[in-house]
Amino acid sequence: MTATVIEMRAIRADGEWADLIRDAWGQSVAGIIRTAKLLAEAKAAIGECHEAGIRGRPGGEAYYPLCLRYQTSTRMTPDEAHALGLAQVTEISAEADALLKAQGLREGAVGARMTALGKEPRWLYPNDDDGRAELLADLNAQVEAVQRRLPELFRVLPRTPVEVRRVPPAIELGAPRGYAQTGSLDGTRPGAYYINLADTAIWPKWALPTLTYHESVPGHHLQLTLALEAEGTSLLHKTLLMNAFIEGWALYAEQLADEIGMYRDLPLGRLGMLQSFLYRAVRIVVDTGMHWKGWSREKAADYMEDTVGLARGAVENEIDRYCVWPAQACGYKIGHLEFVRLRAEAEAKLGARFDLRSFHDAVLKGGAMPLEVLARVVAEWVKNA
């Protein structure tokens, strides 16, 4: 279909434009064919393989620690990251367990109980147009409610608005469940918080608020937009993508929402936040498990399914992602913990002089940065506070 459209446009184009379009199309198709052939040959040569990690590959012993350094911007070793992930899973699971028991769900693993709770009809939207409209209305209400509270947390706020949008139905099956899109650099296009509504059953009502705060405000939209709108910074600093900083901030934003009581009217909304945190902690365990500890795909999938409670199909997709993108999934929780640590350290040093709004402005005004640089920024801010 795409090829036909391009050919039709080429036919309508004149002269040089027609040649350029045909050449580009031909090169693209040829590249796809070459790639498919190489992948087929590689698969045939390797055969069925259950070893998912990179460590056992040539150069993998040196490569994975470099991946971890790049994705987390820390000097944490794979063994240290694995231990941290396990400790976080234990801590977060205990907190989630208490909330689940308060709902009368006492038997089974935490992940299994969260899955059962997420299937209860009282928490689900109808999987039809009316249900989707209700879900979008709830998301808009969540964004509006938290925006009214932002002045309590920040002195500088984004000028560019954020809109809640449904992922276009034509791409839902291959799209992420939820994601943020920044506005334009000149501020003429708003930012967007996209939600995948292919099946509303994946969105129990208690799981949505934390996603909203992660993707919109005070999460991705706020952080990325403030970087774009900052005065006196270079284009590089406005647009630099540092995984642990960006994703760590978004998890920290979920925590900020909790601190100002955004989950109070929906007590299980806090369970949604804990599930989000647990999910990211499990990612560290699974990623380092496969790429450093020699875990098989099956062991990684079983651990993730049992601990978080994701459906097996969703787990398999996640495992595929971690296999081809070593250490990327470790950046989320490691980044979050660093924001928490630096804030606690600043509070301890400044005491009554600590101002949360000024702290947030200090860590955000320079755009995304390596966590080691962030630590120096906070130290300088504390020194001058």
Protein language model features and the residues they cover:
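N-terminal maturation segment of proteins
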Residues: 1-385
